[in-house]
Amino acid sequence: MNVLEVKNLTKSYKKHIPVLNDFSISIPAGRIVGLLGPNGCGKSTLIKLISGLLQPDSGEILVDGNEIGEKTKAIISYLPERTYFNSWMKIEELVNYFEEFYADFDKTRALTLLHDLGIEPKAKLKSLSKGTKEKVQLILVMSRKAKLYLLDEPIAGVDPAAREYILSSIVSTYNPEASIIITTHLISDVEQVLDDFVFLSFGGEILMSGNAEEARNENGKSLDMLFREVFRC
């Protein structure tokens, strides 16, 4: 069974212009998929639809065979593009909150990742840089034993020195029966961890997709170079 099935999905905002138009995709278990495209092409909208934060105009979304609802929310771990925690909270309070709220949260894993990145659990969020706040949020999201991880621009605010560690941590510790969707514009940084990729254009049109390694071998180019060619960057 595929972890994610999206069929004929359409979503419009103002003036009834579709952000996603008859969009379909299937993602099997154990895959890390890069959803790659320019700003405004519908990447974040798709992530919010899968997470249940938005409702589609038409189409179907199934996560582990279930329609979006309470069952899917329990098995999806979602990292939004922007930090949403209260700035007055301590990191250790957030860790305890996640432990209480999510039955699949691994507190030991979260504390280990915080330690490895030199982040003090007793620090308050308001004392941290934007990049460190994003590291904390990513650690909490990836410390759940979910079936589907939705990561919206997970390393956009993270310093280059920490990106490799964070990405390697994602690969080495997530459930092999789960899948991860990563949206990003930092293709050269993330392509090393991607199994599959989707180049998404405006209106949710898929311009190119497939196995990342096969695409590199067949074209003799990195995904980053292919992306620049496809979108004429």
Language-model segments: residues:
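Helix-to-loop junction immediately C-terminal to a conserved catalytic motif
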Residues: 51
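Helix N-cap at the start of a conserved alpha-helix in ABC-type nucleotide-binding domains
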Residues: 160-162
